[in-house]
């Protein structure tokens, strides 16, 4: 019974946070919707922050585990982005909350962790000394994975073919265009190493 109430509170909190925002939802709102006292909510969760962590931490833990699994040996971008998408799809119900609620993004114990994970993912995609252009492409690739998960109306990503399409798009975002500064620098360096490029 207690475990069932715990899950009911968490599910209601997720629904309310997504509609009214974390800041706009109170413990009193949750208690009223469930027809219980605030004390009954506090019996299961010490605070609204505790509830938020109950919802968000499984996703953050899974991202940390996924990053850890893909550091040695270094993954290909496709392997990393595919694994990242799998984690996000597993926890898709909380992705919109993280992606759209400023209070959650700036939460003192959640925001820094999200930013650190994003930095780790960028570094795995580009290397530690990447150019600004490469970092921008990495951000675009990560956005290509995130954004479709919060599209309205929701997109069907249960089909493996759709997931492959999404990963293909993210990998493509990592490739420099012909006019990219990175490509011009590489071409200049290669030219300098040829006999015609030597002084």
Feature names for model-found ranges:
Residues 12-19, 62-70, 144-148:
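Solvent-exposed, amphipathic alpha-helical segments
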Residues 70, 98, 102, 152-153:
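Secondary-structure edge/capping motif, primarily at the C-terminal ends of alpha-helices
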Residues 82-89, 100-104, 124-127:
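Helix-loop "lid/cap" segments that line or gate small-molecule binding pockets
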Residues 95-96, 107-118, 125-199:
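Hydrophobic/aromatic-rich alpha-helical bundle segments in the mid-to-C-terminal region
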């Amino acid at each position: 019974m207690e475990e069932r109430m715990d899950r009911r509170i968490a599910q209601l909190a997720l629904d309310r946070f997504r509609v009214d925002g974390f800041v706009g939802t109170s413990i009193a709102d949750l208690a009223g919707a469930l027809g219980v006292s605030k004390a009954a909510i506090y019996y299961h969760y010490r605070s609204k922050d505790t509830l938020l962590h109950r919802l968000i931490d499984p996703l953050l833990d899974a991202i940390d585990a996924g990053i850890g699994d893909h550091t040695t040996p270094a993954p290909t971008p496709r392997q990393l982005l595919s694994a990242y998408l799998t984690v996000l799809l597993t926890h898709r119900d909380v992705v919109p909350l993280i992606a759209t609620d400023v209070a959650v993004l700036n939460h003192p114990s959640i925001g820094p962790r999200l930013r650190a994970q994003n930095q780790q993912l960028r570094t795995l995609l580009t290397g530690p000394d990447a150019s600004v252009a490469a970092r921008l492409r990495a951000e675009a690739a990560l956005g290509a994975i995130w954004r479709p998960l919060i599209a309205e109306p929701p997109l069907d990503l249960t089909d493996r073919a759709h997931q492959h399409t999404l990963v293909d798009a993210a990998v493509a975002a990592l490739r420099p265009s012909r006019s990219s500064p990175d490509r011009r620098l590489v071409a200049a360096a290669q030219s300098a190493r040829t006999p015609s490029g030597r002084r």
